[in-house]
């Protein structure tokens, strides 16, 4: 009975998502349906932490979503809410749309309308992991919520108060899915280690956790000692119809052929901006992390038609394009060499409909932003086992390549870079307890931190001062990473603008939420949000986003404007 209900759910979810994309015909692969339903049943009956590994396009999302919806059909409950945890912001928007499509589809099976919410660093109003049956969030937001660092706080009689234990309590009774888990990594392998501790703590408290992935390395899983069952699906999957060719030298704009749906993925924002400005194709767009949200959408609209990339269009970008895109008709990929797991993601962008596609791998201008250890190991693998990249079209060969590159020696070399941060995290976790103030001191789940930069039209509200609206935040926010408060890019930005602001208060006026601002006069230490007037960055920001070359010493401070900030 349970199996039949899960079978029905997986079918309805698959068809609903297909129809939402405007596909001319939608059908369920009957040869996979029974395997998907069986995997969903294993997850439903399991406790603790379970691994779900399957190739891209196998239907992992339907597998781990079905058990949550099945609770309403059975009238038996294991979790009141589901957290879908993504490693990158680029994945959130499409996954939210997907969950909304699913929630609407299951109403036809007799389920109530389930709420889908977002809670992460780019939302205007943080929910602190509360606010929906299904909550879309990031690894950072989940981890810092559990660690009592991202919580609701206020001052009462001169004393700070906060709901420090609320996120941990919500998570301990929840169904948590770590989606695209193979992307949870960094140059010091700090994230996998700290997250492994958090996941096991939550599982021991009663949470059900699914680790969903295509090619997670075994060295990652070793940091989750509480891992229980493993579900590996899709063995013997047919090799994808993508011709991979490794080319000598670095990618030049004139080598990009126009006339078919094409994607170009390079390793740095500066390279993406340069190629975008040089490529001569008629329809072109660029997308990277240092762009306002509305500008990303405007760029994409230039090359999309009916939910697909136009036949004569080129889409250019950075790692932001590796995930979160579901354009089935891309026919050509031009990419720089990157760690093997990134190459797998990039090659996975083309030929998704089964038709023939091509992928060209060029040498990178340098190793940055990736660790030299991984770049060296990937180049060696491309020369030998991967046959110049051709083997990356096979899921099983790709998994073996990931394990070879992320071997114990390589990962140990990465981990030595983050020993101090990991030691701080362990000490913090030992002191952390319910119903008390969080421990003092810093804790990180990755070497880099982020500030939210909002580029918007700053307005004046009489004597109340300058402000921006909630809509301005939604349209104009982006994330800037830093490893220390001496970050040269952020300091250069603050020196080049006449005035920078931070948020001092929030109020509702004229049916809109307003964020009132105060000038950022000196240090940005402790500041999480920086606001800059759009008119003040006209020389630094254009249709291709923030000009990072100027923030790396390529530009001069504007005459007669700005103050030097330390």
Curated annotation (Swiss-Prot):
Broadest EC class assigned to this enzyme: hydrolase
Motif DEAH box location, chain numbering: 179-182
InterPro entries assigned to the protein according to its UniProt record, in alphabetical order: Cas3-like_dom, DEAD/DEAH_box_helicase_dom, DEAD_box_RNA_helicase, Helicase_ATP-bd, Helicase_C-like, Helicase_Cas3_CRISPR-ass_core, P-loop_NTPase
Record-listed ATP binding positions: 54-61
Domain notes: Proteins of this family have an N-terminal nuclease domain and a C-terminal helicase/ATPase domain. In some CRISPR/Cas systems the domains are swapped, in others they are encoded separately.
Entry EC number(s): 3.6.4.-
Subunit-structure text: Can form a Cascade complex with Csa5, Cas7, Cas5a, Cas3' and Cas8a2.
UniProt keyword Glycoprotein present: no
Provenance organism: Thermoproteus tenax (strain ATCC 35583 / DSM 2078 / JCM 9277 / NBRC 100435 / Kra 1)
Name of the protein described by the UniProt record: CRISPR-associated helicase Cas3
One term of GO molecular function: hydrolase activity
Gene (UniProt): cas3
Record's function text: CRISPR (clustered regularly interspaced short palindromic repeat), is an adaptive immune system that provides protection against mobile genetic elements (viruses, transposable elements and conjugative plasmids). CRISPR clusters contain sequences complementary to antecedent mobile elements and target invading nucleic acids. CRISPR clusters are transcribed and processed into CRISPR RNA (crRNA). Cas3 plus Cascade participate in CRISPR interference, the third stage of CRISPR immunity. Probably unwinds dsDNA templates, thus providing substrates for CRISPR-associated endonuclease Cas3-HD.
GO biological process: defense response to virus
Domain annotation Helicase ATP-binding: ranges: 41-234
Name of a matching Pfam family: DEAD
SMART domains per the UniProt record, alphabetical: DEXDc, HELICc
